[in-house]
Amino acid sequence: MVIGILGVQGAVREHQEMLHLLGVKTMIVKSSADLDGIDGLIFPGGESTTIRRLIDRYGLLDVLRRQADTLPMFGTCAGMILLASELTEGPSHLGAIPMTVRRNAFGRQIDSFETSLNVEGAGQDIEAVFIRAPFVEQVGEGVRVLAAIGIAAVVVETDLHLACSFHPELTSDRRLHDYFIQKIRRRTAVSV
């Protein structure tokens, strides 16, 4: 198995290290050719506007939108914003997950926090680092909420994709990455 990590900006190295600890090969994706032969793709946390500009500069937007129909994707923090079909302010990016996301929903940088979450299917007390984090205000058809803080959904999935508001790659807790790996394996087993 090879999982790609969008390598234009953000916590790329941290995701790569997490996947290596789980025994998974990685590919840093900076061009459409880098998408060949990967089994899944992670959109790391970072600054969503900057990531979008770089996606456009590298000519990746259209190919990523097409890949979103068949390639499992996992978005963390800014990656969740990129995968959303709708944002409360501004245009959407990839539209891979039918959900409405609010950027910086928990406040500014100074309001960043850490907590533990119970994530359905992935485990109890999962470490979660929230930095200028978004949350999901509304989910569409086929989207399951796996964890929430109050009424704010912070981990969601579809049959194909996974997204979270926080940075699991900035902790030592590998369970959310492992959940994504198992999601890919289940999909691969079904399609064989």
From Swiss-Prot:
Catalyzed reactions? aldehydo-D-ribose 5-phosphate + D-glyceraldehyde 3-phosphate + L-glutamine = pyridoxal 5'-phosphate + L-glutamate + phosphate + 3 H2O + H(+); L-glutamine + H2O = L-glutamate + NH4(+)
Q: Name one GO molecular function term.
A: pyridoxal 5'-phosphate synthase (glutamine hydrolysing) activity
Name the InterPro entries for this protein.
Answer: Class_I_gatase-like (IPR029062), PdxT/SNO (IPR002161), PdxT/SNO_CS (IPR021196)
Recorded hits in CDD domains, A to Z, give: GATase1_PB
The protein's annotated pathway: Cofactor biosynthesis; pyridoxal 5'-phosphate biosynthesis
Annotated positions binding L-glutamine: 46-48, 103, 131-132
Q: State the signal peptide span.
A: none
Q: Which UniProt keywords apply?
A: Glutamine amidotransferase, Hydrolase, Lyase, Pyridoxal phosphate
Enzyme Commission code(s) on record: 4.3.3.6, 3.5.1.2
Please list the residues that make up the active site: 77, 167, 169
What transmembrane ranges does the database entry give? none
Q: Which domain of life is it from?
A: Bacteria
**Which GO BP terms, alphabetically?**
glutamine catabolic process; pyridoxal phosphate biosynthetic process; pyridoxine metabolic process
Entry GO terms, CC: cytosol; glutaminase complex
Q: How does it assemble?
A: In the presence of PdxS, forms a dodecamer of heterodimers. Only shows activity in the heterodimer.
- Family designation: Belongs to the glutaminase PdxT/SNO family.
Functional summary from the UniProt entry: Catalyzes the hydrolysis of glutamine to glutamate and ammonia as part of the biosynthesis of pyridoxal 5'-phosphate. The resulting ammonia molecule is channeled to the active site of PdxS.
Please state what the protein is called.
Pyridoxal 5'-phosphate synthase subunit PdxT
